[in-house]
Amino acid sequence: MSGTLLAFDFGTKSIGVAVGQRITGTARPLPAIKAQDGTPDWNIIERLLKEWQPDEIIVGLPLNMDGTEQPLTARARKFANRIHGRFGVEVKLHDERLSTVEARSGLFEQGGYRALNKGKVDSASAVIILESYFEQGY
């Protein structure tokens, strides 16, 4: 086991991506993947898996603030199931509440409004999801 994990922040137009190391508990953004109504180019996902060879994949689970599911929740689950089904890698879902808010805030502090492009926000959200997963001791 390499201790490498990939995280995805699922969205219908853009899917944020991050890579992290369990040993350091840190993650960094990778370029976001464009999606068509939630469907990514699966060849890009396959390339990421071949390049990084992750032990597991973390997919952010979008929930309402009270913990209830929202329309995007089922689609994120389906995306996670498809990754597992296509590639056989272990996939876990992780609560992503407020990750986009935190990502936008951090990017804005670094570069103002110009830093808030959709792909950067989505991949920064994936970093937050993965680091939150590490912080919870997984």
Swiss-Prot record:
Changing S105I: Allows cell growth, i.e. not toxic. The keyword Thylakoid does not apply. Changing A103I: Allows cell growth, i.e. not toxic. GO terms for molecular function: 3'-5'-DNA exonuclease activity. Keywords: Cytoplasm, Hydrolase, Nuclease, Ribosome biogenesis. InterPro entries: RNaseH-like_sf, YqgF, YqgF/RNaseH-like_dom, YqgF/RNaseH-like_dom_sf. Disruption phenotype: Essential, it cannot be disrupted. Its main location: cytoplasm. Gene3D superfamilies: YqgF/RNase H-like domain. It is found in: Cytoplasm. One of its GO terms (biological process) is ribosome biogenesis. It comes from the Bacteria. Its EC number is 3.1.-.-. GO terms for cellular component: cytoplasm. Coiled coil: none annotated. CDD domains: YqgF. Belongs to the YqgF nuclease family. Monomer. Involved in the processing of the 5'-end of pre-16S rRNA during 70S ribosome maturation (processing does not occur on total cellular RNA off the ribosome); may be a nuclease. A temperature-sensitive yqgF mutant no longer grows when Rho or NusA are overproduced, and has reduced transcription of genes encoded downstream of Rho terminators; transcription increases again in the presence of the Rho inhibitor bicylomycin. This is Putative pre-16S rRNA nuclease.
